[in-house]
Protein backbone atom coordinates (compact mmCIF):
# COMPACT_ATOMS: atom_id res chain seq x y z
CA UNK A 1 0.00 0.00 0.00
CA UNK A 2 1.35 3.43 -0.93
CA UNK A 3 2.19 5.70 2.01
CA UNK A 4 0.24 8.98 1.77
CA UNK A 5 2.37 12.00 0.91
CA UNK A 6 3.07 14.29 3.85
CA UNK A 7 3.67 18.00 3.33
CA UNK A 8 5.70 19.72 6.06
CA UNK A 9 6.22 23.41 6.70
CA UNK A 10 8.28 25.18 9.36
CA UNK A 11 7.26 28.71 10.35
CA UNK A 12 9.87 30.84 12.05
CA UNK A 13 11.26 34.36 11.96
CA UNK A 14 11.49 37.55 13.97
CA UNK A 15 9.27 38.17 16.96
CA UNK A 16 6.41 40.45 15.95
CA UNK A 17 6.79 39.71 12.23
CA UNK A 18 3.59 37.67 12.01
CA UNK A 19 4.34 34.06 12.91
CA UNK A 20 1.01 33.61 14.70
CA UNK A 21 -0.91 35.19 11.83
CA UNK A 22 0.87 32.97 9.32
CA UNK A 23 0.02 29.93 11.43
CA UNK A 24 -3.66 30.93 11.47
CA UNK A 25 -3.61 31.38 7.69
CA UNK A 26 -2.19 27.89 7.21
CA UNK A 27 -4.76 26.48 9.62
CA UNK A 28 -7.51 28.09 7.52
CA UNK A 29 -5.99 26.40 4.47
CA UNK A 30 -6.43 23.01 6.11
CA UNK A 31 -2.96 22.52 7.57
CA UNK A 32 -2.53 20.81 10.93
CA UNK A 33 -0.67 23.50 12.89
CA UNK A 34 1.45 22.94 15.99
CA UNK A 35 2.68 26.01 17.85
CA UNK A 36 6.04 26.22 19.63
CA UNK A 37 7.08 22.63 19.02
CA UNK A 38 10.64 21.88 20.20
CA UNK A 39 12.76 21.08 17.11
CA UNK A 40 13.75 17.65 18.41
CA UNK A 41 10.07 16.61 18.20
CA UNK A 42 9.74 17.42 14.49
CA UNK A 43 10.50 13.86 13.42
CA UNK A 44 7.98 12.50 15.92
CA UNK A 45 5.30 14.85 14.61
CA UNK A 46 6.07 13.90 11.02
CA UNK A 47 5.85 10.20 11.87
CA UNK A 48 2.45 10.71 13.48
CA UNK A 49 1.31 12.37 10.27
CA UNK A 50 2.58 9.49 8.16
CA UNK A 51 0.78 6.98 10.36
CA UNK A 52 -2.52 8.85 10.20
CA UNK A 53 -3.49 7.13 6.96
CA UNK A 54 -3.95 10.42 5.16
CA UNK A 55 -6.05 12.03 7.89
CA UNK A 56 -3.17 14.47 8.44
CA UNK A 57 -1.49 15.25 5.14
CA UNK A 58 -0.12 18.75 5.80
CA UNK A 59 1.65 19.74 9.00
CA UNK A 60 2.92 23.23 9.81
CA UNK A 61 5.10 23.74 12.87
CA UNK A 62 5.82 27.11 14.47
CA UNK A 63 9.36 26.98 15.85
CA UNK A 64 11.01 29.54 18.11
CA UNK A 65 14.78 29.22 17.65
CA UNK A 66 16.12 32.31 19.38
CA UNK A 67 18.51 30.19 21.44
CA UNK A 68 21.62 28.70 19.83
CA UNK A 69 20.85 25.13 21.09
CA UNK A 70 17.41 25.32 19.50
CA UNK A 71 18.96 26.46 16.23
CA UNK A 72 21.33 23.50 16.22
CA UNK A 73 18.45 21.17 17.11
CA UNK A 74 16.37 22.53 14.22
CA UNK A 75 19.13 21.98 11.67
CA UNK A 76 19.63 18.43 12.95
CA UNK A 77 15.88 17.76 12.81
CA UNK A 78 15.63 19.02 9.22
CA UNK A 79 18.62 16.90 8.21
CA UNK A 80 16.97 13.84 9.77
CA UNK A 81 13.75 14.51 7.88
CA UNK A 82 15.64 15.02 4.61
CA UNK A 83 17.37 11.67 5.12
CA UNK A 84 13.95 10.02 5.37
CA UNK A 85 12.72 11.65 2.17
CA UNK A 86 10.59 14.27 3.91
CA UNK A 87 11.69 17.74 2.88
CA UNK A 88 10.04 20.49 4.96
CA UNK A 89 9.64 23.98 3.54
CA UNK A 90 10.76 26.80 5.79
CA UNK A 91 8.91 30.12 5.94
CA UNK A 92 10.86 32.96 7.55
CA UNK A 93 8.96 36.12 8.52
CA UNK A 94 10.65 39.47 9.05
CA UNK A 95 9.87 43.18 9.11
CA UNK A 96 11.70 46.47 9.43
CA UNK A 97 12.84 47.72 12.83
CA UNK A 98 10.33 50.58 12.71
CA UNK A 99 7.43 48.22 11.95
CA UNK A 100 8.42 45.82 14.72
CA UNK A 101 8.84 48.63 17.24
CA UNK A 102 5.35 49.94 16.39
CA UNK A 103 3.85 46.48 16.82
CA UNK A 104 5.46 45.92 20.21
CA UNK A 105 4.37 49.37 21.35
CA UNK A 106 0.83 48.66 20.15
CA UNK A 107 0.50 45.48 22.23
CA UNK A 108 2.51 47.01 25.11
CA UNK A 109 4.74 44.00 25.48
CA UNK A 110 8.53 43.84 25.71
CA UNK A 111 10.60 42.14 23.04
CA UNK A 112 11.64 38.66 24.26
CA UNK A 113 15.34 39.55 23.91
CA UNK A 114 15.43 43.19 24.99
CA UNK A 115 16.28 42.40 28.63
CA UNK A 116 16.62 45.73 30.45
CA UNK A 117 17.30 47.60 27.22
CA UNK A 118 15.13 49.09 24.48
CA UNK A 119 12.88 47.18 22.09
CA UNK A 120 15.20 48.04 19.21
CA UNK A 121 18.10 46.38 21.06
CA UNK A 122 16.15 43.16 21.37
CA UNK A 123 15.24 43.28 17.67
CA UNK A 124 18.87 43.76 16.70
CA UNK A 125 20.00 40.90 18.90
CA UNK A 126 17.38 38.60 17.37
CA UNK A 127 18.34 39.56 13.80
CA UNK A 128 21.91 38.48 14.48
CA UNK A 129 20.83 35.19 16.07
CA UNK A 130 18.53 34.30 13.16
CA UNK A 131 20.63 35.59 10.25
CA UNK A 132 21.96 32.14 9.35
CA UNK A 133 18.52 30.55 9.60
CA UNK A 134 17.07 33.25 7.34
CA UNK A 135 19.61 32.32 4.69
CA UNK A 136 18.40 28.71 4.73
CA UNK A 137 14.69 29.53 4.42
CA UNK A 138 12.75 28.49 1.33
CA UNK A 139 10.58 31.59 1.51
CA UNK A 140 11.27 34.91 3.23
CA UNK A 141 8.30 37.24 3.67
CA UNK A 142 8.80 40.85 4.69
CA UNK A 143 5.59 41.90 6.45
CA UNK A 144 6.56 45.55 6.97
CA UNK A 145 3.92 46.93 4.61
CA UNK A 146 1.52 43.98 4.59
CA UNK A 147 -1.85 43.96 6.27
CA UNK A 148 -3.38 40.68 7.43
CA UNK A 149 -5.24 40.11 4.16
CA UNK A 150 -2.15 40.72 2.04
CA UNK A 151 -0.11 38.33 4.17
CA UNK A 152 -2.86 35.74 3.85
CA UNK A 153 -2.81 36.14 0.07
CA UNK A 154 0.94 35.52 -0.09
CA UNK A 155 0.69 32.46 2.12
CA UNK A 156 -2.23 31.18 0.07
CA UNK A 157 -0.11 31.48 -3.06
CA UNK A 158 2.83 29.64 -1.50
CA UNK A 159 1.10 26.97 0.57
CA UNK A 160 -2.47 26.70 -0.70
CA UNK A 161 -3.94 24.02 -2.93
CA UNK A 162 -6.12 24.37 -6.02
CA UNK A 163 -9.54 25.70 -4.97
CA UNK A 164 -8.18 26.49 -1.48
CA UNK A 165 -9.46 30.05 -1.84
CA UNK A 166 -12.80 29.00 -3.28
CA UNK A 167 -15.88 30.17 -1.43
CA UNK A 168 -17.91 27.28 -0.05
CA UNK A 169 -21.62 27.87 0.46
CA UNK A 170 -24.20 25.81 2.29
CA UNK A 171 -27.68 26.66 1.01
CA UNK A 172 -30.30 25.74 3.61
CA UNK A 173 -34.02 25.72 2.91
CA UNK A 174 -36.22 26.09 5.99
CA UNK A 175 -39.74 26.79 7.21
CA UNK A 176 -40.35 29.98 9.16
CA UNK A 177 -42.81 28.16 11.41
CA UNK A 178 -39.89 26.07 12.68
CA UNK A 179 -37.59 29.03 13.29
CA UNK A 180 -34.62 30.60 11.54
CA UNK A 181 -31.38 28.60 11.08
CA UNK A 182 -29.11 29.88 13.83
CA UNK A 183 -25.95 29.67 11.71
CA UNK A 184 -27.28 31.62 8.71
CA UNK A 185 -25.10 34.44 7.35
CA UNK A 186 -27.79 35.62 4.93
CA UNK A 187 -31.54 34.91 4.88
CA UNK A 188 -33.84 35.12 1.84
CA UNK A 189 -37.63 35.07 2.23
CA UNK A 190 -39.53 33.28 -0.55
CA UNK A 191 -42.99 33.89 0.87
CA UNK A 192 -43.60 36.56 -1.77
CA UNK A 193 -44.23 33.71 -4.23
CA UNK A 194 -47.61 31.92 -4.39
CA UNK A 195 -47.70 28.88 -2.12
CA UNK A 196 -48.07 25.51 -3.92
CA UNK A 197 -49.60 24.19 -0.71
CA UNK A 198 -52.88 25.76 -1.83
CA UNK A 199 -52.78 23.94 -5.16
CA UNK A 200 -54.32 20.58 -4.30
CA UNK A 201 -52.52 18.70 -7.08
CA UNK A 202 -49.13 19.99 -5.85
CA UNK A 203 -49.62 19.77 -2.10
CA UNK A 204 -48.27 16.22 -1.64
CA UNK A 205 -45.08 16.98 -3.55
CA UNK A 206 -41.98 19.00 -2.59
CA UNK A 207 -39.85 21.63 -4.25
CA UNK A 208 -37.54 18.89 -5.50
CA UNK A 209 -40.30 17.42 -7.65
CA UNK A 210 -40.47 18.76 -11.22
CA UNK A 211 -44.12 19.80 -11.08
CA UNK A 212 -43.61 21.94 -7.96
CA UNK A 213 -40.27 23.30 -9.15
CA UNK A 214 -41.73 24.34 -12.50
CA UNK A 215 -44.74 25.93 -10.81
CA UNK A 216 -42.57 27.98 -8.44
CA UNK A 217 -40.10 29.09 -11.10
CA UNK A 218 -42.91 30.13 -13.45
CA UNK A 219 -44.37 32.60 -10.95
CA UNK A 220 -43.94 36.36 -11.58
CA UNK A 221 -40.76 37.58 -9.93
CA UNK A 222 -39.19 34.16 -9.40
CA UNK A 223 -36.62 34.43 -12.19
CA UNK A 224 -35.91 38.09 -11.41
CA UNK A 225 -35.32 37.16 -7.79
CA UNK A 226 -32.91 34.38 -8.75
CA UNK A 227 -31.04 36.65 -11.17
CA UNK A 228 -30.69 39.55 -8.76
CA UNK A 229 -30.03 37.51 -5.64
CA UNK A 230 -27.39 35.45 -7.44
CA UNK A 231 -25.71 38.69 -8.55
CA UNK A 232 -25.81 39.96 -4.96
CA UNK A 233 -24.28 36.72 -3.71
CA UNK A 234 -21.47 36.99 -6.24
CA UNK A 235 -20.71 40.48 -4.95
CA UNK A 236 -20.89 39.39 -1.31
CA UNK A 237 -18.82 36.28 -2.06
CA UNK A 238 -16.04 38.34 -3.60
CA UNK A 239 -15.99 40.54 -0.51
CA UNK A 240 -15.93 37.55 1.81
CA UNK A 241 -13.04 36.07 -0.17
CA UNK A 242 -11.05 39.29 0.19
CA UNK A 243 -11.65 39.16 3.94
CA UNK A 244 -10.50 35.54 4.09
CA UNK A 245 -13.98 34.12 4.80
CA UNK A 246 -14.36 30.89 2.85
CA UNK A 247 -17.55 29.45 4.29
CA UNK A 248 -21.00 30.96 3.93
CA UNK A 249 -24.42 29.71 5.02
CA UNK A 250 -27.36 30.96 2.96
CA UNK A 251 -30.83 30.35 4.36
CA UNK A 252 -33.87 30.35 2.07
CA UNK A 253 -37.22 30.29 3.82
CA UNK A 254 -40.91 29.83 3.15
CA UNK A 255 -43.80 28.98 5.47
CA UNK A 256 -43.21 25.26 5.97
CA UNK A 257 -39.91 24.59 4.21
CA UNK A 258 -41.47 22.13 1.78
CA UNK A 259 -42.21 23.83 -1.55
CA UNK A 260 -40.98 27.33 -2.41
CA UNK A 261 -37.80 27.48 -0.33
CA UNK A 262 -36.77 24.01 -1.50
CA UNK A 263 -37.20 24.86 -5.19
CA UNK A 264 -35.42 28.22 -4.85
CA UNK A 265 -32.57 26.74 -2.77
CA UNK A 266 -31.96 24.10 -5.43
CA UNK A 267 -31.80 26.74 -8.15
CA UNK A 268 -29.49 28.98 -6.13
CA UNK A 269 -27.20 26.02 -5.61
CA UNK A 270 -27.05 25.38 -9.35
CA UNK A 271 -26.26 29.02 -10.12
CA UNK A 272 -23.61 29.34 -7.43
CA UNK A 273 -21.90 26.13 -8.53
CA UNK A 274 -21.83 27.40 -12.11
CA UNK A 275 -19.97 30.47 -10.79
CA UNK A 276 -17.23 28.36 -9.19
CA UNK A 277 -18.59 28.25 -5.65
CA UNK A 278 -18.41 24.98 -3.73
CA UNK A 279 -22.05 24.24 -2.92
CA UNK A 280 -23.93 21.98 -0.53
CA UNK A 281 -27.74 22.18 -0.48
CA UNK A 282 -29.55 21.12 2.70
CA UNK A 283 -33.33 20.99 3.18
CA UNK A 284 -33.65 21.34 6.93
CA UNK A 285 -37.39 20.93 7.34
CA UNK A 286 -38.27 18.71 4.42
CA UNK A 287 -40.45 15.84 5.65
CA UNK A 288 -41.10 17.53 8.96
CA UNK A 289 -44.75 18.35 8.36
Curated annotation (Swiss-Prot):
> For binding ATP, which residues are annotated in this chain's numbering?
13-20
Any idea which positions bind GTP?
Answer: 64-67
What's this protein's family per the entry?
A: Belongs to the RapZ-like family.
Protein name per the record:
Nucleotide-binding protein Francci3_1634
What is the phylogenetic placement of the source species in the record? Answer: Bacteria, Bacillati, Actinomycetota, Actinomycetes, Frankiales
The organism's superkingdom is given as Bacteria
* InterPro entries reported for this sequence: P-loop_NTPase, RapZ-like, RapZ-like_N, RapZ_C
Output the Gene Ontology terms for molecular function: ATP binding; GTP binding
Q: What are the UniProt keywords, alphabetically?
A: ATP-binding, GTP-binding, Nucleotide-binding
Q: What does this protein do?
A: Displays ATPase and GTPase activities.
Gene3D superfamilies from the UniProt entry: P-loop containing nucleotide triphosphate hydrolases
Amino acid sequence: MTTPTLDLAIITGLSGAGRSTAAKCLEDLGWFVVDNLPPELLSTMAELGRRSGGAISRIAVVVDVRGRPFFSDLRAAIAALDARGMHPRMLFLEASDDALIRRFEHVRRPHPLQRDERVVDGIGRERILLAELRGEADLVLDTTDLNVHELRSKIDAAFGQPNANRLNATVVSFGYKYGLPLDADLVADCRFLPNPHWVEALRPFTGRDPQVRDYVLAQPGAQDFLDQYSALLRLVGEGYAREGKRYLTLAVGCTGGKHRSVAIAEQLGIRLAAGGVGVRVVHRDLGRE
